[in-house]
């Protein structure tokens, strides 16, 4: 292959898109796009009681926090707080037709052995995952003290009482010995920052707030309300890849507006074979999770237990592309080998498009020209076929994006496309780019009145991404200064295991307060900065998108990076820390 020619093509695709696009957050005049369409609001009286633990966020991270604390500490009163109408997090909000996990269900859905659940498919539907998360909440008694349809407005530390004061938009003011925040990655929807956004007179909504009252149907399809409708979708990421076949089946006309094409590989979904679980030994899920984690981090294993496109593709590329801490061999030769392997994989995906899409011009427009991990890979067995339907039009904007909206439609490439319904598949506020407290919607006031928004004004400061000096009995679950991996649920499982261990130590040793020491925090921050710039060159050569801050990776604070030594090493750091038993880097009082 002519590697320089490949690089030049990728550069052209990057450069014609410029540096990113602007977004409009779903707040203020656009807050309707973030309202809950699924659960009718219920009124209640404010609470002024006390709990052992307040957990902000009732998604996978919040549920695992509650479950681990129940298992490890025996703490009785654990209160989940969420603005949604139930547990589930992203699986509560995302109910769009076709929604599924893109990581194998057997390694993604947490606590399968503990709950006694076996997923019905290799890649479960959103409703199946949501129901499983509800079962977790029931099993561990997490509904009992939960507050739904409730937004935290402030967390404030009371030093004399060694308690957190939790204020909410319902007038609650209650106390908690510990607080844990797990606000998630897909917490707040964002819209494209388009001229005319406020003037569009048709029906519109964000995919994470799906309006089934308008479209009809449910998460499995059956969108009968779209039979006579012209529908537009802005965005071609993983949501649209799953959604498009259902829209195409029911809409009179479907326009898919594309800035950058997705890289779509085979999904290969299948039902769980009868009796599959009968031969599984105790501990099977953790072993399977760790096997997947290692393979997708470039660490060879004796066996590939998952055997999907994540493991088959990522295992070939990850050693050279991802920061695993393995520095063996000539770095330049490793990089070249990785680049060649990357090109071969992307050529495979581009060839698949030619084999499926019948119109040559449409096929050409759907081809992604960037490296594998510039964007999260997509997997689907029906998306590309959608573009063979006569009622579907791909509006490729040549990397420029939609120009503007009018009262009746969407303008792209100088042409107006009239639509009755406009669906925004434009993602969420990004945790690396949007300040934590802004994305959370509240500030955290620690010892001496210091606000987290002030302490983190130039970027995060933590120990292991979990605890912050000056904020006692407080835990934050995120990817910032912590491990990052394609299986987010696994990483949350490891973080919450660590959190519960720390709380257990505090309780067993008779202390009231635990926090990161100043020295412990400083040492971890130095390690984050030392490793933070490792993937900047890679990201700078990607087309603009979520991972590279819309083409400006250098514009993100390095302090907000994930741990640069790889997620496997991050998990090992936490395990070695627990095994040492000396609680290094913490202060207990």
UniProtKB/Swiss-Prot annotation:
GO terms for biological process: antibiotic biosynthetic process; pentalenolactone biosynthetic process. One of its GO terms (molecular function) is FAD binding. NCBIfam families: Neo-PentlctneDsynPtlE (NF045818). Keywords: Antibiotic biosynthesis, FAD, Flavoprotein, Monooxygenase, NADP, Oxidoreductase. This is Pentalenolactone D synthase. It comes from Streptomyces arenae. It catalyses: 1-deoxy-11-oxopentalenate + NADPH + O2 + H(+) = pentalenolactone D + NADP(+) + H2O. It is an enzyme of class 1 (oxidoreductase). Gene3D superfamilies: FAD/NAD(P)-binding domain. The keyword Flavoprotein applies. InterPro entries: FAD-binding_Monooxygenases, FAD/NAD-bd_sf, Neo-PentlctneDsynPtlE. Its EC number is 1.14.13.170. Binds 1 FAD per subunit. The keyword Flavoprotein applies. Belongs to the FAD-binding monooxygenase family.
């Amino acid at each position: 292959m002519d590697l320089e020619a490949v690089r030049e093509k990728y550069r052209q695709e990057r450069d014609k898109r410029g540096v990113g696009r602007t977004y409009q957050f779903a707040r203020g005049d656009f807050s309707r796009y973030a309202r809950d369409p699924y659960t009718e609001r219920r009124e209640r009286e404010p609470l002024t009681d006390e709990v052992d633990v307040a957990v902000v966020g009732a998604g996978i991270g919040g549920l695992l926090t509650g479950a681990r604390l129940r298992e490890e500490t025996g703490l009785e009163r654990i209160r989940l707080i969420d603005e949604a109408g139930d547990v589930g997090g992203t699986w509560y909000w995302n109910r769009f037709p076709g929604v599924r996990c893109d990581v194998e269900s057997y390694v993604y859905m947490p606590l399968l052995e503990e709950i006694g659940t076996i997923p019905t498919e290799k890649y479960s539907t959103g409703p199946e995952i949501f129901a499983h998360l509800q079962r977790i909440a029931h099993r561990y008694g997490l509904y009992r003290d939960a507050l739904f349809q409730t937004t935290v407005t402030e967390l404030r530390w009371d030093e004399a009482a060694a308690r957190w004061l939790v204020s909410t938009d319902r007038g609650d003011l209650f106390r908690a010995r510990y607080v844990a925040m797990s606000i998630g990655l897909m917490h707040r929807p964002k819209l494209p920052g388009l001229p005319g956004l406020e003037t569009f007179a048709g029906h519109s909504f964000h995919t994470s707030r799906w309006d089934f009252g308008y479209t009809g149907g449910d998460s499995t399809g059956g969108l009968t309300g779209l039979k006579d409708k012209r529908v537009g979708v802005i965005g071609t990421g993983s949501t649209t890849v799953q959604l498009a076949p259902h829209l195409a089946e029911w809409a009179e006309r479907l326009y898919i507006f594309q800035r950058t094409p997705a890289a779509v590989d085979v999904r290969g979904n299948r039902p769980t074979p009868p009796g599959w679980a009968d031969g599984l030994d105790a501990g099977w899920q953790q072993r399977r999770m760790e096997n997947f984690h290692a393979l997708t981090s470039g660490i060879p294993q004796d066996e590939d237990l998952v055997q999907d496109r994540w493991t088959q593709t990522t295992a070939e590329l990850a050693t050279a592309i991802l920061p695993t801490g393995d520095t063996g061999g000539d770095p330049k030769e490793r990089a070249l080998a990785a680049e060649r392997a990357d090109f071969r994989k992307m050529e495979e995906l581009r060839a698949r498009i030619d084999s499926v899409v019948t119109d040559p011009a449409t096929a050409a427009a759907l081809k992604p020209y960037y490296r594998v991990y510039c964007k999260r890979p997509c997997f689907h067995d029906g998306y590309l076929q959608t573009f063979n339907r006569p009622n579907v039009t791909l509006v490729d904007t040549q990397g420029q994006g939609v120009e503007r909206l009018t009262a009746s439609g969407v303008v792209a490439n100088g042409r107006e496309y009239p639509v009755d319904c406009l669906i925004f598949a434009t993602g969420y506020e990004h945790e690396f780019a949007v300040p934590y407290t802004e994305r959370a919607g509240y500030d955290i006031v620690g010892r001496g009145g210091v606000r987290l928004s002030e302490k983190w004004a130039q970027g995060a400061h933590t120990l292991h991404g979990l605890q912050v000096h000056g904020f006692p009995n407080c835990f934050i679950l995120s990817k910032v200064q912590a491990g990052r991996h394609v299986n987010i649920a696994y990483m949350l499982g490891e973080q919450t295991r660590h959190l519960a261990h720390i709380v257990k130590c505090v309780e067993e040793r008779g202390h009231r307060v635990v926090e990161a020491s100043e020295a412990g925090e400083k040492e971890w921050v130095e390690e984050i900065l030392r490793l933070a710039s490792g993937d900047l060159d890679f990201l700078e050569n990607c087309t603009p998108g979520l991972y590279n801050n819309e083409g400006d990776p250098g514009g993100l604070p390095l302090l907000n990076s994930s741990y640069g030594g790889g997620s496997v090493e991050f998990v090992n750091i936490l395990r070695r820390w627990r095994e040492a038993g000396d609680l290094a880097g913490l202060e207990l009082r």
